[in-house]
């Protein structure tokens, strides 16, 4: 896979670029870009490094230094101390093909050695921009393969989660009158309320992790990166899911915040004591 690292900056830097700035592309991609985000932050990256590990999404000092140096070529003076988080992602880059075939990008189609399995691999630039069209193309392939009956009562829209930060005063007052939880701000950086978090959990295919809450509501995406709101989000998740706070995870397996033995209600209490451990 090809690994790319990004840096995300605080919203106070969002006005340093009015639109996406690309550098001259290379064989590895479009290079380091500088772009404002739809939420007002500034984003720089990615690097492009071929690695062997399929789960190698760690961030590195070398990657950060490379992004900082190359982003400065497009926008000088981006303050390093305004970086609020860094992250990395992987792209399934095609490096080897069967004998007689050359490497390519945008490999989309039914695998020759696995009938019914559709490959969508080698998504090079502009893979993100063409993702909606790719999805429609693959959907048509599946329809052709399976010949399914069209669901006549299918509803293609769903009610979104209210965004209190972007709502008008009248809309906020109405929501709070209906449910006071919309007036209880949990994430102060992004002004996300308890009502929004509850909606994210209770909706079909609701959130079960703090990252799930983050993706649905932006709670934890602000300057403090969940340093303030995370304990309360864990508490709300545990209460709604009917589990101990020690079972709540950030994302995947092994990402629990609390050690076993720190039961519900212990998040704000004194550190758990191992059996037989004396108080100092």
Residue ranges and their predicted role:
Residues 13-18:
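Short helix-loop capping/hinge motifs at secondary-structure junctions, enriched
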Residues 187-189, 224, 229:
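Short cysteine clusters
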Residues 55, 193-204, 227-245:
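Iron-sulfur (Fe-S) cluster-binding segments and ferredoxin-like electron-carrier domains
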Residues 3, 23-39, 50-185, 192-205, ...:
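C-terminal catalytic lobe of FAD-dependent flavoproteins
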Residues 242-274:
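Low-complexity, small/polar and acidic-rich linker and loop segments
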Residues 229-238, 265-280:
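Short flanking/linker segments adjacent to small metal-binding domains or redox-active Cys/His motifs
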């Amino acid at each position: 896979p090809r690994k790319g690292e990004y840096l995300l900056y605080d919203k106070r830097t969002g006005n340093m670029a009015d639109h996406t700035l690309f550098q001259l592309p290379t064989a590895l991609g479009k290079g380091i870009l500088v772009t404002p985000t739809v939420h007002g932050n500034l984003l720089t990256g990615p690097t492009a490094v071929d690695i062997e590990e399929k789960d190698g999404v760690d961030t590195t000092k070398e990657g950060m230094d490379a992004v900082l140096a190359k982003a400065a070529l497009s926008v000088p003076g981006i303050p390093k101390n305004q970086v609020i988080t860094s992250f990395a992602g992987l792209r399934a880059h095609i490096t080897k093909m069967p004998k007689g075939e050359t490497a390519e990008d945008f490999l989309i189609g039914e695998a020759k050695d696995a009938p019914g399995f559709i490959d969508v691999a080698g998504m090079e630039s502009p893979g993100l921009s063409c993702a909606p069209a790719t999805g429609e193309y693959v959907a048509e392939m599946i329809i052709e393969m399976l010949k399914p009956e069209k669901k006549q009562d299918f509803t293609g829209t769903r009610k979104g989660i209210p965004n209190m930060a972007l709502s008008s005063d009248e809309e906020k007052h109405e929501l709070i009158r209906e449910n006071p939880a919309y007036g209880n701000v949990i994430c102060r950086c992004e002004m996300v309320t308890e009502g929004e978090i509850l909606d994210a959990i209770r909706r079909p295919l609701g959130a079960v992790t703090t990252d799930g809450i983050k993706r649905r509501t932006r709670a934890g995406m602000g300057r403090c990166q969940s340093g303030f709101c995370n304990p309360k989000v864990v508490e709300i998740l545990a209460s709604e899911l009917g589990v101990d706070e020690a079972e709540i995870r950030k994302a995947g397996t092994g990402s629990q915040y609390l050690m076993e033995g720190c039961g519900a209600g212990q998040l704000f209490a004194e550190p758990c004591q191992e059996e037989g451990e004396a108080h100092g």
